Design a protein with these regions (language model features):
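Alpha-helical adaptor scaffolds
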Residues: 45-48, 52-64, 68-69, 74, ...
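Ankyrin repeat A-helix N-terminal signature
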Residues: 20-25, 53-59, 86-92, 119-125
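Ankyrin-repeat-protein effector appendages
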Residues: 2-9, 102, 111-114, 119-164
Length: 164
């Protein structure tokens, strides 16, 4: 058995030691496992990664460590969720910003009609909404007017749904 196989050993749910350390915010353990060869992008049976576990529990320093080691910011779990969707849904602007700075795609559709922006609007996280709208506004420049109108309409619909 190789050293990597030992480090990336899995439990009955497909979780690795790296995922468990990320879930618990154990940044030192996360870094040691990564330096020892753990797969930063290993996925469990639900398609979740250590980065997703760290985000869900708002472990900012663990998130940054995983990003520093090349964690995939655009990976989608089996349910369709992405690290950015989880961060936007948590209301944590620091983690959301770190993901965007690392190349997370704010346009990824996680489930029909659901993006990180829609989740932030629905939950009333206005600072995250503004943060997510910036890259979208840049992407929309030069697109046909119909595309821009559809984006504006979707944003209004999500905002109205959030007020109900």
């Amino acid at each position: 058995m190789s050293r990597t196989q030992i480090i990336d050993g899995r439990d009955e749910n497909g979780n690795t030691d790296l995922m468990r350390a990320a879930l618990n915010g154990q940044s030192g353990t996360v870094k040691a496992l990564l330096l020892g060869g753990a797969d930063v992008n290993a996925r469990n049976h639900e398609g979740r990664t250590a980065l997703m576990f760290a985000i869900v529990n708002l472990h900012t320093s663990t998130v940054q460590t995983l990003l520093d080691f090349g964690a995939d910011v655009n990976v989608q779990a089996s349910c369709g969720c992405t690290p950015l969707l989880l961060a936007a849904g948590s209301g944590d602007i620091g983690i959301t910003r770190a993901l965007l700075n690392s190349g997370a795609d704010p346009e990824t559709i996680c489930r029909p009609g659901i993006t990180a922006l829609v989740v932030a609007i629905e939950r009333g996280y206005s600072a995250i909404v503004e943060l997510l709208k910036r890259p979208l506004a840049q992407a929309v420049q030069g697109k046909p007017k119909s595309f821009r109108s559809n984006l504006q309409s979707a944003t209004r619909t999500a905002a109205l749904a959030a007020t109900k």
